[in-house]
């Protein structure tokens, strides 16, 4: 089985965890379950199928594909942050971030800044490109040689440290008819959360793309929440 995913990276292999391919009149009932995935994978795929419904389940990852850092201090030269290394494993090599997960490592390319309290993206920040000098200060604290005060970022705000890569969506619907997602929540993805392509009569009710309660995270999908390509109905 092979397929190409629009508007994403094109890795040689897309590891698929739940392949729902060549099926007719199938109902998947999650009963409110949380499906927790490991590594960079495509959790759900509906392909070359008709009248498949997925119901009452949530999708998340054991290790978020991005790393969240809480700002504790800013000045005109540096930004100090704290990172929970258990939740977001990383190493500092040659004074640069190397983020780690099951079967993958990657450096930093940019960050997004989220406001304390509201959880909104801080105005006029968007993706801020950076891969500069990092100095461990002991414990969970690090000093970044990066003046973020000039961007309006303050202590208490959250930086989502990320790479520009977007290898895999959270759920792919490909060459399928009459597919429905009912109360399906996509909490994290390394690309778009939901991608529907070359399909027709797709239906989604309830659920959506949102932070999973209790994680303390502010970020979900690596790109669009939903993306439709060559789809009708």
Q: Across the structure, where does each feature detected by a protein language model lie?
A:
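All-beta strand scaffolds that present successive hydrophobic residues in beta-strands
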Residues: 27-30, 52-56, 155-156, 178-183, ...
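Generic recognition of long tandem-repeat/solenoid scaffolds
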Residues: 77-86, 123, 132-149
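Extracellular beta-strand-rich solenoid/capping regions of secreted or surface-exposed proteins
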Residues: 2-27, 36-55, 62-84, 164-176, ...
């Amino acid at each position: 089985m092979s397929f190409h995913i629009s508007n994403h990276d094109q890795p040689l292999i897309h590891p698929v965890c739940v392949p729902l391919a060549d099926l007719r009149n199938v109902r998947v009932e999650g009963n409110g379950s949380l499906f927790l995935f490991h590594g960079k994978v495509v959790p759900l795929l509906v392909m070359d199928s008709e009248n498949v419904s997925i119901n009452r389940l949530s999708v998340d990852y054991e290790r978020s594909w991005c790393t969240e850092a809480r700002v504790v201090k800013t000045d005109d030269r540096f930004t100090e942050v704290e990172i929970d290394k258990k939740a977001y494993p990383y190493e500092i090599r040659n004074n640069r971030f190397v983020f780690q997960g099951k079967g993958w490592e990657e450096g930093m390319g940019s960050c997004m800044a989220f406001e304390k309290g509201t959880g909104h993206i801080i105005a006029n920040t968007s993706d801020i490109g950076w891969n500069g000098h990092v100095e461990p200060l002991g414990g969970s604290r690090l000093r970044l040689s990066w003046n973020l005060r000039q961007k309006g970022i303050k202590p208490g705000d959250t930086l989502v440290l990320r790479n520009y890569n977007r290898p895999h969506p959270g759920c792919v619907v490909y060459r399928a008819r009459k597919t429905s997602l009912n109360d399906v929540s996509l909490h994290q993805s390394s690309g778009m959360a939901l991608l529907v392509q070359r399909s027709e009569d797709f239906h989604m009710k309830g659920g959506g793309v949102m932070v999973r309660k209790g994680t303390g995270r502010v970020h979900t999908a690596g790109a669009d929440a939903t993306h439709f390509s060559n789809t009708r109905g």
